[in-house]
Amino acid sequence: MDNNTVITINTSDDTLQTYYSTIAKCPSLTSLINDNTISLNIRTNHMVMILNYFRNINSIQYLYPIANVARKLGIEFNEDGYVYINIGGKIFYVEKKLMSNKLGYFEAFFRNYNQLDPDYSSILIDRCPNLFAKIMSFLTMSNQELSGTTRLELQYYCYNLRNYFIKLEHFKYMDYLLDHYCSHNYRLVTDMNISDNTVKTTLENSQNIYAIFFKNRIDIKTLKDNISIKINNIESNTNLLILSNELVFDDNFIFIKLESDKKLPCDIEITFPDTTIISGDSCFFKTKFRCDKHNGIIRDTSSHNVTSKNGNIYTVDVDIDQNKITIPVKNLITNIFNEQEVDKFSDVLVSDIIFVTDKFSLKGAYVELSCNTINESINCSENSQIIAKCSLKKSFGSKQKYRINFPFTTKYIKNVLPHYSGNYEIVINLENKYEGPLYLKYRTIAIHK
């Protein structure tokens, strides 16, 4: 066939045209020519991407997101560090290191089927390919919003399990930043190089916030006056924000926000004053979230999202003869962690509790947090004393959802929440008798011993 012959390509939703010379080196396409026409069950935008690759407009990397389609046309990829996987019958071409580091599922998957490297597509992973595509966008793009369904799918793939068990041997608890602490966005920085008073890492997104812990007490003003940051070995004084002194707990903790307009990823080097001793025990965290300051308190604007080990649903059976509902906090913990897991923790924190009722109004109800200071018995109502009174605030847009409005003070967060155990109870006092189940959605964070 002459190279200048016009070939019409009927896609699944439109029609395209190209010269025979453009597709001549693709036997999978040329073999389908009938009357100078090719009919394909391929979306137009995908076919345009493939034709632009044949036209040398785009590199082969441009086709990675549509590896499933490219493979059907005989286009194979061969880049070091990349592998094929099969999600729900759709083939993805992904970076192996990224998948292993971010998703615990694939760390085990690649290890178990190592003999198949680099083509694991013969093993079906029976999950939704559309949700997996969203997960890939989340892993590779900054400021990517996730739906609740996608968050649940992340749990299936064991997304960064280290998020849920933070090792803090040298430190106590946060005062104001409990919401930050529970944020799904936190990631351990495991590739950070700590040498003397210098920390080196890589900034992968346009904005990262680093939570940094120190072994000794620190002076915020000294840090602000003496800290230095280099981006790609160039001194920078505009990309640093150390949050105010009120957000330091035990004088061992700060937030640093780094922003860069440089081409990403870029190398970051943070140098602290000589008197500063940095902890190297997995105590550096990075996150990519927006934060705003309200009444002197930094709040994570995405803190309402729940993830694995957070947001479990707990059903409470209520005696219809009572005008109050009593919930042992221990039940909230054992509903998530088994006894073997709990034994590994020094504390488990519970926060962000939302009550969901079944067509029943909790209007006029109020909440008390009580504690038995005499013994460790689980049923401690008789000897308990009230340590905090809280109000129930109706969640926006819902008639049946109520959030506990805890008094947000340093003393309460520090002295109560970190010590939740079997002798704490949440008591909901009602105006009317309650009938039916009560559902709770809440967060937990486990602190290793």
From Swiss-Prot:
InterPro entries: BACURD1-3, BTB/POZ_dom, SKP1/BTB/POZ_sf, T1-type_BTB
Transmembrane parts of this sequence: none
Single GO BP term: protein homooligomerization
Name of a matching Pfam family: BTB_2
Domain BTB: 79-148
Protein family membership: Belongs to the mimivirus BTB/WD family.
PANTHER family in the cross-refs: BTB/POZ DOMAIN-CONTAINING ADAPTER FOR CUL3-MEDIATED RHOA DEGRADATION PROTEIN FAMILY MEMBER (PTHR11145), RE57120P (PTHR11145:SF8)
Protein name: Putative BTB/POZ domain-containing protein L742
